[in-house]
């Protein structure tokens, strides 16, 4: 920032600011927070007049799924990214602040010269700048440019490679490409000690857990975990229920069965027309307390980050769908096989939706689940960018499977839209029947307690037949 004259000019804006202290932060415990939404005397604020610019990066789901395919994985952070990007000098008068170093000095006027936190356009300006940097340097650093375009979320880099040598090379390419934009990568951390030098390791011990886009990652054991803060009350309101559910941050749906149960419970409260501040009825309150008590087990669950074996010869995706009167959902697994026959099957992601409050038939809901699965598998393929050998889609509804295999002109208009959506992303040959007891999507259609989920092999690794070469026909 730079000091400017205090004289008034047309079209300027002063951004209010205050300090916020966060004791849980490893660095920058005291941060300045700017409020560009504060209205002036004419009723407008800077944020009310700005466009947000849209999205210039891949969404979080794609980046997190892709992060799970790397044998050697590492993360980094763009140091002070916003402060590395200049604002047009003609527009800096819209980013003025009042400041003084201590209480004895007079208040001075400054203009912020760079992209500023708290403004509506800041995320787009920063991420679009990174995209432009990647485009400009694509000729010099094609590998680094590709990663900047696909594996960066805001200022967080999550990427990796299949071999240690490739990972080291990628790391150096990223350092060089960001240096071209005057930026520095720091807070390095990886799942291999040879990949990240001790001096770069941001003081993390081997056993430390690092927060990666809201999910905790233990690089030593290379696994994800969750930290859900639980407040157990004797009596609860609908507001308490929603507050607790909102704390379960699970972008990939790894806890999808637990989240589905929470969604179903919340819909039940809406059906009872309970106000936000009303206490829950005794039976409902007891049910909720049991759920919250079991929810603490979530913090003990560890999930492998990497979902593929080293040097896979065959990679298969297996998706499952199911529905009940309460909800419907889809689950996707990755099966990888080496040339010597070693197999690995891991849960990739899940999605669930509560059923409409209007009475709907089970076949109709099963169709919704199949469409949801088709979309989820399409997104997973888009994220992984792997050479998938085969894709298998499983449903325990013979009715839906018969609809999928029928010619379009033979279908009722009521089902046609969903089936056409499914056919855009899948082929009828990929769909197969699975017995209900072997269908892990049953858990996202009905929900499950955390205690049962922790040890549920069917959820984490899919049905046992995936570990063989013989599948149900």
Language-model features, listed with the residues they occupy:
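Conserved beta-strand/loop block within the catalytic cores
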Residues: 1-55, 162, 187, 194-217, ...
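Catalytic-core region of right-hand nucleic acid polymerases
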Residues: 2-128, 225-268
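Polymerase palm active-site segment centered on the conserved acidic dipeptide of motif C
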Residues: 4-7, 71, 75, 159-223, ...
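Catalytic palm subdomain of template-directed nucleic-acid polymerases
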Residues: 39-49, 84-86, 90, 146-181, ...
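C-terminal reverse transcriptase regions that engage the nucleic-acid substrate
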Residues: 44, 61-68, 111, 148, ...
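A short, polar/acidic, helix/strand-boundary loop motif
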Residues: 55, 107-131, 336-368, 406
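Active-site palm subdomain of RNA-directed nucleic acid polymerases
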Residues: 123-169, 173, 375-393
């Amino acid at each position: 920032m730079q000091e400017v004259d205090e004289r008034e000019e047309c079209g300027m804006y002063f951004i209010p600011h205050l300090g916020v202290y966060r004791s849980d932060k490893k660095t920058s415990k005291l941060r300045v927070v700017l409020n560009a939404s504060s209205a002036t005397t004419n009723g407008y604020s800077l944020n009310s007049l700005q466009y947000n610019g849209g999205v210039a990066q891949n969404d979080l789901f794609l980046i997190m799924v892709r992060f799970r395919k790397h044998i050697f994985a590492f993360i980094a952070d763009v140091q002070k990214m916003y402060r590395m990007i200049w604002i047009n000098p003609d527009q800096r008068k819209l980013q003025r602040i009042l400041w003084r170093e201590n209480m004895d000095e007079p208040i001075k006027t400054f203009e912020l010269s760079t992209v500023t936190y708290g403004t509506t356009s800041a995320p787009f300006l920063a991420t679009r700048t990174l995209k432009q940097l990647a485009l400009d340097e694509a000729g010099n650093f094609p590998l680094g440019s590709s990663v900047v375009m696909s594996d960066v979320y805001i200022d967080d880099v999550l990427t990796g490679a299949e071999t240690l040598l490739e990972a080291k090379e990628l790391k150096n390419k990223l350092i060089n490409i960001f240096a071209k934009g005057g930026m520095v990568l720091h807070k390095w951390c990886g799942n291999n000690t040879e990949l990240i030098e001790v001096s770069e390791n941001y003081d993390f011990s081997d056993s430390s857990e690092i927060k990666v886009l809201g999910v905790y990652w233990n690089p030593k054991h290379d696994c994800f975990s969750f930290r859900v803060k639980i407040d157990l009350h004797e009596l609860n309101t609908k507001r308490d229920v929603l507050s607790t559910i909102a704390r379960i941050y699970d972008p990939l749906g790894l806890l999808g069965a637990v989240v589905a149960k929470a969604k179903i419970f919340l819909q039940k409260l809406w059906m009872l027309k309970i106000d936000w501040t009303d206490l829950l009825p005794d039976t409902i309150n007891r049910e909720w307390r049991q759920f919250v008590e079991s929810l603490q087990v979530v913090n003990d669950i560890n999930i492998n980050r990497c979902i593929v074996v080293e040097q896979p010869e065959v990679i298969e995706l297996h998706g499952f769908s199911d529905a009940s009167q309460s909800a419907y959902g889809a689950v996707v697994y990755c099966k990888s096989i080496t040339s010597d026959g070693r197999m690995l099957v891991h849960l990739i992601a899940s999605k669930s939706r509560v059923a409409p409050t209007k009475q709907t038939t089970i076949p109709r809901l099963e169709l919704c689940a199949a469409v949801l699965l088709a979309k989820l598998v399409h997104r997973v393929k888009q994220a992984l960018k792997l050479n998938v050998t085969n894709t298998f889609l499983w449903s325990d509804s013979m009715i839906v499977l018969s609809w999928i295999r029928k010619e379009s002109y033979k279908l009722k208009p009521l089902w046609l839209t969903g089936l056409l959506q499914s056919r855009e992303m899948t082929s009828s040959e990929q769909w197969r029947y699975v017995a209900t007891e072997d269908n892990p999507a049953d858990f996202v259609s009905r929900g499950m307690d955390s205690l049962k989920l922790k040890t549920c092999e069917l959820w984490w690794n899919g049905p046992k037949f995936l570990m063989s070469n013989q599948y149900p026909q």
